[in-house]
Amino acid sequence: RRLITEKALEPVPGNPKDPGTVYLCAADNEGNMISYIQSNYAGFGSGIVIPGTGIAMQNRGKGFCLEPGHANAAAPGKRPYHTIIPGFLTKQGKPMGPFGVMGGFMQPQGHVQVLTKLIDCGLNPQAAIDAPRWQWTQGLQVNMEPEFPAHLIEGLQQRGHKIGYDINRGAFGKGQMILATPHGTLMGGTEPRCEGACAAW
């Protein structure tokens, strides 16, 4: 309320610092759930806007390789490699909940780590998302968040991994999750590494 005054102001458009991906998950009391991720890629995507909608088309076709015979070579009916991965967790064919971890190459790594904390370690959605993460980059290099337990880092070093530390918390992915309990209660978790929120009504 402090920022709203009684004086007229000329509207000023926002100036986002960086482009990025958006992840959204939602669930209702009837059991409907959605896992949604959107990313135009390469800033403004393809630069093509669907007439009359204002919706910019994505540019994930940039992920194709033009080298003949390459596994990701462009061809009719093929989809390019990309990192848009909206996740959805089921158990014995029943929906448990939507989740996603944004962050390019970190997405599949983040999915595995969050689900491991949730399923194998028994953490709730928020604790699973809060837990420290690692990121494999290439070769034997593994970057760790500073909070990672020292004995696990030492174990990786003994196996020959090169350990790096990244204080840019956003480099380790940005996750959101909703989990339905067996009793039908919905629990949510949101990323402390970036802007995010859980809301219920």
Explain the meaning of each model-derived region.
Residues R2-P11, D18-P19, E147-W201:
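Cofactor-centric catalytic regions
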Residues V101-L123:
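Alpha-helical support elements that line or immediately flank enzyme active sites
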Residues V22-C25, S35-V49, V101-Q107, M177:
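Glycine-rich phosphate/pyrophosphate-binding beta-alpha loops
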Residues R1-N40, G52-T53, R60, I167:
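Internal maturation/activation junctions in enzymes
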Residues N29-G97, C121, P125:
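Active-site rim segments in enzyme catalytic domains, especially the processed small/beta chain
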Residues E30, G77-K78, H111, D120-G170:
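Extended C-terminal subregions enriched in glycine
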Residues P19-L24, M33, H82-G87, K174-G175:
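Short glycine-rich loop/turn motifs
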Residues N40, R60-G63, G103-F105, R133-Q135, ...:
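Acidic, glycine-rich active-site loops and adjacent beta-strand->loop/helix elements
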